Amino acid sequence: MVIGVGNRWRGDDGAGLAVARRVRELAPAWVEVRELEGDATALVEAWSGAEHAVVVDAAESGAPPGTVRRFDAAAGRLPVHSLRSSTHAFGVADAVELARALGRLPGRLDVYAIEGASFTAGGSLSPEVERAVDDLATALTHP
């Protein structure tokens, strides 16, 4: 299962959604792909029953734009500073910890953060993030 999180109307904050759309194009039909905009608490329900879930969101940590980082969320707490949550009322890291407390984490949960360059309203994905989206979607569908 691949879940893209973000806001398509705020520039690079749409990176997770773009990865989900690209994975949907590349992956076999049996791969479940979801796009979530808004409050990340919906993640807890979205990955319910999944043995392995991949979540992709934008990051704003000061790394170079287009940098992709992977976190093993089932193994421990996510570094909150590495994930963007300002356009989500409740961020991915918060949703992971809520699911952990409720005993509702998938057996394996990989969270990918794509470093953005611009999160302005009405903007599109930056070239660096577009490349990262394509590279990550390809890596996820052709391991």
Show which residues each predicted segment covers:
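N-terminal catalytic or cofactor-binding beta/alpha core of small enzyme domains
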Residues: 1-118, 123-134, 139-143
